[in-house]
C-alpha cells in the first residue's frame, strides 16, 4: 500500500469528498473555502508534524482510545451517508447501511485487506472521472464556460425531467432551513398522503394553517409563503417554476453568501488540527518530497473534480437546490442528461465509487489504530470483537438521519483537541504522561462546549465560535498544559 494511497484513503472519506460539491452548490465561491482546507490541511500536517521513532509516550492508552473515538465518528458519518444515498435511490435506508457496514466489517477482520486499498481507490477514481467526462461531453461546454453560464442564469427553474415534477419524490430537507420559501405563485401536489403546514403572508397579516392532503390534491402558494412538510412526504412541483430554496439568480450564487466570516477561522483551526492528529500522531518518519508531491497532486485532482461536478450539476440539475442541498443527491443528481446509450450505466458509477472509497478508508483507519497499539504489534487493528462492536454501533446510530459532513467536522475537532497538541509539542520523555493529562483536558472542554452548542444555537460572531467549533478553545488549553509540562523544574 503506497504512502499516497494510504493518506488519501485516510483523509478523504466519501463524507468529506462528496461534501465538497455540495458546499460549492450551497454557497458558491464560499464553498471553495472548504475545498481549499481539504487540500491544504493534510499537506501542512505532513510537513510540520513532529515525527520521530517510537517513544514511551506511545505506550499510553489514551491516544488509542481518543483515536478510536475519532474513527468511530468517521465511520458513523459515512454510514449515515450510505443510508441517505440508499433512501435517495429508492431503497430502504437500512439496506445501504447494511451493504456498507457489512463490506467494511469483512475487510476489517481480514488481515490481508491492506493489499486491496490501491485497487479500491483506483476503482473509486474511475467511478468519479467517467461520469464527469460523460457529463461534460453531453453538456458540450468546458468547466470554465459552464461556471460562467451558471453565473449568468436569471434563475434556477425546475426541469421537466425532475423527479419532483413527475411522478413526485420524497422531499428531505438538506443543509439550511427546514421550510420552503416561495418567490412566485406555485402549485404543490401531494403524491401521497401528507399534512402540509403553510405560513401565508398577506401584507401585514400572517396566517398559519395545516392541510391534510390525499394523493392528487393540490395547494397553491403565493410569493412569500412558507411550506413545511412531514418527514417522508412525497410532493410534486410545477415544471418551469423557480426552485424553492435556490439562489435568486446565477449572479447571487456566484457572488456567494455573506455568512459569519468568523466561522471560517474556526473551521480552518478544526480541519488543520484534525489533519495533524489523524495523519501524524504515532507515525514514525517524515514523508519524502516525492511522496508529498504525489499526495498533493491527488488532492488537487479531487478538489478539481468536486468543483467541476458542482458546476455541471448546477447547470443541468437545478432541482438539487430544492429544500436545501443534501449531500446524497450529489451521488446521483436527479435530472442530469447523459449521452445516448449511457444513461443506464454511468449514473450508478458514482455511488459505487463512494462505496469503494469507504471500504478503502475503513481498512486504512484500522491500520492507523494499529500503529498506536500498546502491544507494539498492531493487534488492536485485528481485534474482531472490538471492530465488530464499533461497526455495529456506528451502523445502529446511522439508522437515524444526521448530517455526514458535520460528523466529519466533529471527528476532526475531537482529534484536534485531544491529539494534535501532543503531536506539535510532545512532552519530555520523563513526563510523557502529561500528554494524557492534556488530552483529557482537551476532551473535557471539547465535550462541554459541544453540548453547550446544541442548546445555544444561533449565536453569531466571536461569542458563538467556541460553541460551533469547540476545538478553538479545547486545543489551546491542552497545549498550555503541555507547555507547563515542558518547563524545567526548579531546584
Language model region names:
Residues 54-58, 110-121, 277-306, 365-382, ...:
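Hydrophobic, small-residue-rich membrane helices and short re-entrant helix-turn-helix hairpins
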